[in-house]
Swiss-Prot record:
Protein name per UniProt: ORC1-type DNA replication protein 1
Source superkingdom: Archaea
Function text: Involved in regulation of DNA replication.
Nucleotide-binding keyword on record: yes
Protein family per UniProt: Belongs to the CDC6/cdc18 family.
Keywords linked to the UniProt accession: ATP-binding, DNA replication, Nucleotide-binding
NCBIfam families in the record: orc1/cdc6 family replication initiation protein (TIGR02928), PRK00411.1-3 (NF001625)
Gene giving rise to this polypeptide: cdc6-1
GO biological process: DNA replication
Residues engaged in binding ATP: 70-74, 213, 225
Keyword Signal among UniProt keywords: no
GO MF, one example: ATP hydrolysis activity
Length: 414
C-alpha cells in the first residue's frame, strides 16, 4: 500500500528556505525603473513633443518604432508618468492612458476601456460602437484637460481594421474642452502600409525610432536591476556578461536579457543552490527559447502549421542530417491537406508561408543552385523537433496526423 504524502506544512517548508531574490519583480517587463539607462535621447525627444500638454495645447500624435526589448514601452510609460506628475504640480489636468493592444485588440474593447478609465459605466460587450464612442467623448469633454492615449503594440489593433484609429485621430474636432493625443508603439516598421492614408497622415505626425542596445548597454541595465533583484553575493562573475552576450545576439533585446537573469535565478533557487552560475544561464537560455517557440508555433495559422509539420516529417523520416527542399516539402504538405480535408494552397503561396516561418526563426531556408535543374530552397529546422511536433499536434485539426507518417513515407521512400 502506497502511503500518501501529508500536505501539512507544504508551503511553510518552502518559505523557510532562504531566497536568493531580494525583489524578483524588478526583472519583469511590467517594471519601470526610476532611472532608464541609455535612452536619454529618446526620453528627451518624446518629452519635447509632449511638453505642449503642460501648456494646455494638443501634442502631436507620435509613432514609436523599434524591435522587441529596445525600451519603447518603458520610455513611453516613464515619460507619461513624469508628465502626469508635473501636471499635478502645476494644477493642470493631464491624463495618460496606457492600452496594450495585444490584449485590447478590437475597436469596441478599446473604446469601452477608454470610457471606463474615465468612470463611464460601459459594458464590455453589447452596445453599438457609436454609443460607446459617444460615452467616451462625453466623459472626457466635461472639463479642460489633455489626454494622451498610449496604444502599445498598435499593429495588433489594426489587423481588425483601422476605423477606431480614424475616429480617434479626428476626435478633437468634436471636443469643446478636452484635447486628445495618441502615441502608437510598434515592433513593425511596415505596419502603417495597411493604414488608410488619412489615418497614416494624422497618426504619424512625429516618428521616433529606437535602436537596439549593444552588449555593453545591456550589461549596464542588468547590473542596475541585479542590485535591486538579488541578495548580495548571489550572482556568479560570468552571469551578467553571459546574459548580455545572449541578448546582444537577439538584436540587443534587453527584455530577453532580463528574462534570462530572472529565469537563471529561478532555476538555481528551485535546486536550492546558494548562487546563480553560468550553467544556470545556459539552461535558462534553452528554456526560454523552447517557451518562445512553443508560443509562436501555437499561434500559427493552420496552413503554416501544416507546412511546418511537413518539414518535421521529412526531417524525422529518411531526411535526418539532410536539408529538405521546397519540392519535397510541398509534396508532403499536399498529402497532409488531403488527409484532414483542408484546402491545398499553391506551391508559391506555401513557399511564402515557409519564408514567414524563416522570418520567425523557426526554420532556416537557403537558396541553392542545382545547376541545369535550376534553383531551389533548402530548409532546415531551427527549433527543437520533438517539442515543436508536440505543440503542433495539440491543435485539434492536426490530431488526425499523429500516425500519418507511415502512409506518407512508404510512398515516398520505398
Amino acid at each position: 500500500m502506497i502511503k500518501a504524502q501529508s500536505l501539512d506544512g507544504l508551503f511553510e517548508k518552502l518559505l523557510d528556505g532562504k531566497s536568493i531574490f531580494k525583489n524578483k519583480e524588478v526583472l519583469r517587463p511590467s517594471y519601470t525603473p526610476d532611472l532608464l539607462l541609455h535612452r536619454n535621447d529618446q526620453i528627451n525627444s518624446l518629452a519635447t513633443i509632449l511638453v505642449s500638454a503642460l501648456r494646455g495645447e494638443t501634442p502631436s500624435n507620435v509613432l514609436i518604432y523599434g524591435k522587441t526589448g529596445t525600451g519603447k514601452t518603458a520610455v513611453t510609460r516613464y515619460v507619461g508618468k513624469e508628465l502626469e506628475r508635473v501636471s499635478e504640480d502645476k494644477s493642470i489636468f493631464c491624463s495618460v492612458v496606457y492600452i496594450n493592444c495585444e490584449v485590447i485588440d478590437t475597436q469596441y474593447r478599446l473604446l469601452a476601456n477608454l470610457a471606463r478609465h474615465f468612470e463611464e459605466e460601459v459594458p464590455m460587450t453589447g452596445w453599438p460602437t457609436d454609443q460607446v464612442f459617444m460615452k467616451f467623448k462625453e466623459a472626457i469633454d466635461s472639463r479642460e484637460q489633455v489626454i494622451i492615449i498610449i496604444l502599445d503594440e498598435i499593429d495588433k489593433l489594426i489587423k481588425k481594421g483601422d476605423d477606431v484609429l480614424y475616429n480617434l485621430s479626428r476626435i478633437n474636432t468634436d471636443l469643446r474642452k478636452a484635447k486628445v493625443s495618441m502615441i502608437g508603439v510598434s515592433n513593425d516598421l511596415k505596419f502603417t502600409e495597411f493604414l488608410d492614408p488619412r489615418v497614416k497622415s494624422s497618426l504619424g505626425e512625429e516618428e521616433l525610432i529606437f535602436p537596439p542596445y549593444d552588449a555593453e548597454q545591456i550589461s549596464d541595465i542588468l547590473k542596475q536591476r541585479a542590485k535591486m533583484a538579488y541578495n548580495d553575493g548571489v550572482l556568479g562573475e560570468m552571469v551578467i556578461p553571459l546574459c548580455a552576450a545572449f541578448a546582444a545576439q537577439e538584436h540587443g533585446d534587453a527584455r530577453r536579457a532580463l528574462d534570462l537573469l530572472r529565469v537563471s535565478g529561478e532555476i538555481a533557487e528551485r535546486e536550492n543552490q546558494p548562487q546563480v552560475l553560468e550553467e544556470h544561464v545556459r539552461r535558462a537560455q534553452e528554456k526560454i527559447e523552447i517557451d518562445r517557440v512553443v508560443e509562436v508555433v501555437r499561434t500559427l495559422p493552420t496552413q503554416s502549421k501544416l507546412v511546418l509539420y511537413s518539414i518535421i516529417l521529412l526531417r524525422n523520416r529518411g531526411r535526418e542530417g539532410k536539408n529538405v527542399t521546397t519540392g519535397e516539402m510541398y509534396n508532403v504538405y499536399r498529402q497532409l491537406c488531403h488527409h484532414i480535408d483542408v484546402d491545398i494552397l499553391t506551391q508559391r503561396r506555401v513557399t511564402d508561408l515557409m519564408s514567414e516561418l524563416d522570418m520567425l526563426g523557426i526554420v532556416n531556408a537557403v537558396v541553392v543552385s542545382k545547376g541545369r535543374y535550376g534553383r531551389t530552397k533548402e530548409i532546415s529546422l531551427s527549433v527543437p523537433v520533438e517539442n515543436t511536433r508536440k505543440v503542433l499536434l495539440e491543435d485539434y485539426r492536426l490530431k488526425p496526423l499523429v500516425d500519418f507518417k507511415a502512409s506518407v513515407f512508404n510512398k515516398m521512400f520505398s
